[in-house]
Amino acid sequence: MTNANTQLQSILGQFAGRPDVTPDQEAQLRTTILADSSLLQKLNQAAASGHLKGFEPGVGGSEPLTGSYDKASGIVTLPAFEPGSAPTTNLRGSLRLQEMSIRFANSSYVDANQQRQHVTQDMVTNLQSTINSSPTLAKEINRAVTTAIDSRDPKSPMLLENFAPLSGTVAGGTFNPATKTMSIPPGTVGQTQSRFNKFYANDLTFVLGHETQHAFNQTSMTSSYRQFDAAVTAIAKDNDPVNDYTLPIENLIKSAREDEAKAQISGWNALVDRVRQTNPAVDLNAMSRIGTSRVEDFVEVNPANPTQIQARPGITFSHDGSLPMTPQNISAQAAYYFDKPPKGTPGLSALQTTGIGFHGDSDYPNYYGAGAVSRAIAFDRAYAHPVSGVAPQMQLDMQRLRFEEELLEHNGITLPPGTTATPQIYWDTSTNPPTRGLLQHTQGTHQHISPIPDIDPRQPVHSPPERAEHPNNELLEKIRSGVRGLDQQAGKSWDESSDRLSASLLLMATEKGFTAKDDLKFAFNTPTEKLAGGEILHMWREGHHSPDPAAHRAHMTTQEALAVPADQRLAQMEVMQQTKAQEIMQAQQQGPCKHNQHKLGRCDYASDHESN
């Protein structure tokens, strides 16, 4: 069990010695920290680095809802304590938020001029004051930072784990489910406090509520990605050379559409509660005057009485002005928000369009579409095959999907590693006959190249791909259990590196012929004169008797194991298994393999198929 380090022990001791702190309050703080091993580890690091130097109670009656952090002094001001000395969920959430704020405060970012800048105290203060200004927002963020992705796994990350400055795209904010990170534009939070409160606070309140809901939606979006992966894989593998990915892409975009609509509703609820703190009688008329255009997705002028504001058709507010998450409200908000056409659409004002993405010129279908199409291309290149001598042909109904080739590329088409120099040909079936199109890998350029597309491969930040279900699930779960053990030994929680290690070990285990029934062991190397500790990842199985001990052991460098994303490593394994199956069939038809050397149980001849 991890204990508080010397620095954190000193900080807790100083807190206990304050005249304005009761024994119950000191005990509640200490036990809340010690009850959350991940929080304890992070606070140990903050204290050891000198970024955390003390805790102090808030001023009675005016404590910040979730606490606050002062970068210069390193002091965290705590929210109001609950009665008793036992750990509390509210204090745990506040401490997690403050630990995130400490890391945010001491981070840096690259500005629009490609210059590295440090996060300022104004950025921290404006972010935290926004959270503390809306009880609804404070409650939801507190819930997000204390809700585990997998409640059965004590090492599971929370739904939200990081704040970061946003760069590289036009957006009010983003949430990345791969890293559990909410990113905020420095230009918004970097204002002086007086200017921020006057011009930016309401908008950021909405944005934080919106992005927090994305954190809650990530589980359902992960399921949507798995369904997408299964559907496009089936299309690519079937015996029809025409691979039309329109339907699975459409279904994935529909999931993103619902995700965004729910996030909008949460943004409204955070904002109306902020306004309610200074105007308890807030109504739609008051909301229309608070100085943010975001409310126009929810309300409109009453045509019969232009002095009054009413809900837009299909939207039904509660008596207190909040917006319930009903199917009707979700559907209406999806139409008013997600379905807006892209910026620059003739005849429409800026408020009637959407301008997001790297260039700020994209609508939502193309923003999410870039990632969906990139993902489909990856599976197509891994599994598509000629049928009766006919080469595979990728098809998309661009009009049905509301896609524009140029906007897809502006948002970023990513071609699989090792194949980026080969553009992806597709056929647009919305025309008769279908029109040939070309998508190029344009990472870093974000430019459309005539006559065919070219752009940077930014995956949609709100919903990056998750790992698909895999046929060798039982073996994979055994390996993941072993990797959890390695993580625990290293004092770290599960993260993307853990996924990469697991997928690499699965590929290596499959090549060696290991199965889920084997007693598998895992370890990193210990330090030697030539190697530092942890440079080599070992795997072996016990209980097998063989004259060849090497048959039961395998290893690879940790660098190699971490080099490839889990999805790509799993795709490599499936291709390897397909190749092996084909070789076995050929061997059965042609007789024994005549090659002198065998590798990992299969004939060791070269293949020109590159898996990704």
Task: List the model feature ranges, each with a label.
Residues 22-72, 80-82, 105-184:
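Auxiliary, metal-adjacent structural segments of Zn-dependent hydrolase domains
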Residues 1-3, 263, 590-612:
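Non-Sec secretion/translocation targeting segments of pathogen effectors
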Residues 295-461:
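Pan-zinc metallopeptidase signature
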Residues 218-256:
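Post-HEXXH active-site segment of zinc metalloproteases
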Residues 243-310:
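Metalloprotease/metallohydrolase-associated module, dominated by Zn2+-dependent proteases
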Residues 202-219:
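Active-site recognition of the HExxH zinc-binding catalytic motif
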Residues 193-198, 202, 249-257:
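Second-shell loop/turn segments in exported
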Residues 399, 460-548, 565-585:
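Extended non-globular interaction regions in eukaryotic gene-expression and organellar proteins
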